[in-house]
């Protein structure tokens, strides 16, 4: 079963896009920059937990791009 946010967004796909953004940056390093635990980032990347709006903003500020792409895959 695909996990989804209330908006209908697919958590597995969101997690994959966040992992893609992270690239070669270690989870622990990025988590510290974002102000979350490594475990929380791991859950988000595995689609077990959805990102907060605050986290989406921080990811866009850190890597560029858009929150739309993170949430929907549309550029």
What do the predicted segments below correspond to?
Residues 1-25:
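A short, Lys/Arg-rich alpha-helix, primarily the initiator
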Residues 54-69:
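DNA major-groove recognition helix of helix-turn-helix/homeodomain DNA-binding modules
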Residues 2, 69-75:
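Short amphipathic recognition helices of helix-turn-helix/homeodomain-type DNA-binding modules
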Residues 47, 51-52, 70:
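Amphipathic, hydrophobic secondary-structure cores in small proteins
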Residues 46-48, 57, 61, 75:
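Residue-level detection of the helix-turn-helix DNA-binding "recognition helix"
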Residues 23-46:
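Short alpha-helical DNA-recognition segment
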Residues 19, 28, 57:
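Residues within the helices of the helix-turn-helix
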